[in-house]
């Protein structure tokens, strides 16, 4: 789960990470009061969406007067913004962050993530802040520093000092780097964070470090023990279908193809999509109904798939271990009848009660294509999708 910048900075403040003075508004009527709370020679008006690269897309505006601030806020609030990180989709701007301006001397990059290779929390630091870190890593890998935190002892003071020395920090900023890194690490542990990022972390003319931007991603699997963070969720920034799927305990990710997929198990779902691609097709989604699939959840899964007008055929691939194939068949029949399905459905069932499941499908009177194996199912669903295109 992603947080907005203003939410992330609120967490930063709780952990002693310095941020600019700022006020979030979601109504233009609150703008004057917000400006009055920020003693600054100018302001920054920042669109709040779940994406980076907002500045390049016109979502961050530097203003010097209240009139300019009002114009910028009027243009942004209530509109939508697409960046290079939104895959062509414009996200709604329902809130703005109004911040003070700073005299910036130098910009750094700082992030903390879970490294699956070393199985540690890992800091990534660079003196080349304010840029896409991927581009820096590609063009100048020597500018990227990393620090792996041993989970048995935690972040050590000497590791913070090494980074401060490497960045050439002195005085107040040198000491601040240690507190920022310690705050980062504790925040990640306390809040089940999968990614923390400041880009840029700026060194001001007063030799102080300030988090000019903030990005926080929370491990969605841990939200059950983070009720305070759940309240920060902004569904308007999410794909409507993915949000609805989560409400029904379905794992759904929208893709760009025309072949809908319904599978139980993430690994089997990925293998199914691979075979569709191998046969020349394009999956329209990833959808894992899970091991405890019920007829009701299967029906909801069908509705999710069909919510995309691009879908021209559907492949249902179920291996009945925990879930019984006859129950899946009931769900398929129920869903087809409920939604009045008009596109081809290819079904591959294997496992517990598979014979009974196939009998139910055969006796349903519905136009459902059965397959004898996964390879056969992939071939058939791609073929019927191609026919629908002609």
From Swiss-Prot:
ATP binds at residues 46, 99, 102, 107. The keyword Iron-sulfur does not apply. It catalyses: succinate + ATP + CoA = succinyl-CoA + ADP + phosphate; GTP + succinate + CoA = succinyl-CoA + GDP + phosphate. Its cofactor is Mg(2+). Substrate binds at residues 264, 321-323. SUPFAM superfamilies: Glutathione synthetase ATP-binding domain-like (SSF56059), Succinyl-CoA synthetase domains (SSF52210). InterPro entries: ATP-grasp, ATP-grasp_succ-CoA_synth-type, ATP_grasp_subdomain_1, Succ-CoA_synthase_bsu_CS, SUCC_ACL_C, Succ_CoA_ligase-like_bsu, Succinyl-CoA_synth-like. Binds 1 Mg(2+) ion per subunit. Residues 9-244 form the ATP-grasp domain. Mg(2+) binds at residues 199, 213. GO terms for molecular function: ATP binding; magnesium ion binding; succinate-CoA ligase (ADP-forming) activity; succinate-CoA ligase (GDP-forming) activity. It is an enzyme of class 6 (ligase). Pathway: Carbohydrate metabolism; tricarboxylic acid cycle; succinate from succinyl-CoA (ligase route): step 1/1. The keyword Metal-binding applies. Its EC number is 6.2.1.5. One of its GO terms (cellular component) is succinate-CoA ligase complex. Keywords: ATP-binding, Ligase, Magnesium, Metal-binding, Nucleotide-binding, Tricarboxylic acid cycle. GO terms for biological process: succinyl-CoA metabolic process; tricarboxylic acid cycle. Pfam families: ATP-grasp_2 (PF08442), Ligase_CoA (PF00549). Belongs to the succinate/malate CoA ligase beta subunit family. Heterotetramer of two alpha and two beta subunits. Succinyl-CoA synthetase functions in the citric acid cycle (TCA), coupling the hydrolysis of succinyl-CoA to the synthesis of either ATP or GTP and thus represents the only step of substrate-level phosphorylation in the TCA. The beta subunit provides nucleotide specificity of the enzyme and binds the substrate succinate, while the binding sites for coenzyme A and phosphate are found in the alpha subunit. This is Succinate--CoA ligase [ADP-forming] subunit beta. The lineage of its organism: Bacteria, Pseudomonadati, Pseudomonadota, Gammaproteobacteria, Thiotrichales.
């Amino acid at each position: 789960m992603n947080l907005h910048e203003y939410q992330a900075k609120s967490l930063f403040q709780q952990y002693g990470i310095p941020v600019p003075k700022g006020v979030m508004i979601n109504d233009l009527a609150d703008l004057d009061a917000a400006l009055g709370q920020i003693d600054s020679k100018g302001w920054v008006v920042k669109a709040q969406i779940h994406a980076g690269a907002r500045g390049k897309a016109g979502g961050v505006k530097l203003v010097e007067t209240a009139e300019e601030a009002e114009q910028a806020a009027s243009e942004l609030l209530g509109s939508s913004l697409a960046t290079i990180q939104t895959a062509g989709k414009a996200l709604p701007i329902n809130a703005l962050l109004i911040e003070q301006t700073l005299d910036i001397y130098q910009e750094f990059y700082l992030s903390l993530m879970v490294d699956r290779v070393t199985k540690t929390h890992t800091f990534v630091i660079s003196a080349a802040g304010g840029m896409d870190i991927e581009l820096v890593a590609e063009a100048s890998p020597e500018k990227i520093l990393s620090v792996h935190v041993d989970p048995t002892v935690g972040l050590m003071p000497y590791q913070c000092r090494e980074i401060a020395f490497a960045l050439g920090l002195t005085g107040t900023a040198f000491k601040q780097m240690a507190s920022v890194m310690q705050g980062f690490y504790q925040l990640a542990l306390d809040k089940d964070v999968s990614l923390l990022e400041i880009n840029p972390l700026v060194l001001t003319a007063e030799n102080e470090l300030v988090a000019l931007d903030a990005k926080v991603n929370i491990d969605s699997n841990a939200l059950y023990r983070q009720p305070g963070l759940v309240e920060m969720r902004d569904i308007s920034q999410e794909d409507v279908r993915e949000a609805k799927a989560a409400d029904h305990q379905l794992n759904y990710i929208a893709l760009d193809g025309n072949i809908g997929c319904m599978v139980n198990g993430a690994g089997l779902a990925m293998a199914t999509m691979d075979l569709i691609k191998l046969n020349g097709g394009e999956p329209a989604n990833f959808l894992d109904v899970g091991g405890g699939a019920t007829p009701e959840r299967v029906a909801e899964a069908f509705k999710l798939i069909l919510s995309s007008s691009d879908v021209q055929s559907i492949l249902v691939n179920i291996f009945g271990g925990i879930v019984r194939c006859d129950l899946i068949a009931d769900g398929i029949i129920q869903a087809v009848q409920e939604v009045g399905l008009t596109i081809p459905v290819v079904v591959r069932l294997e496992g517990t009660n598979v014979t009974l499941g196939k009998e139910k499908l055969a006796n349903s009177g519905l136009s459902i294509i059965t397959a004898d194996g996964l390879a056969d199912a992939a071939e058939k669903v791609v073929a019927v999708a191609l026919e629908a295109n002609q």
